[in-house]
Amino acid sequence: DDPTSTFTCPGGSNYK
C-alpha cells in the first residue's frame, strides 16, 4: 500500500 495514495484510519490501517 502506498501511503501517498491511501488515507489512514485512526487504527493505522490503510484503505484504497
Swiss-Prot record:
Family: Belongs to the thaumatin family.
Organism encoding this protein: Taxus baccata
Entry keywords, A to Z: Cell wall, Disulfide bond, Secreted
UniProt keyword Hydrolase present: no
Principal localisation: secreted
Name recorded for this polypeptide: Thaumatin-like protein 4
Annotated compartments: Secreted; Secreted, Cell wall
A single cellular component GO annotation: extracellular region
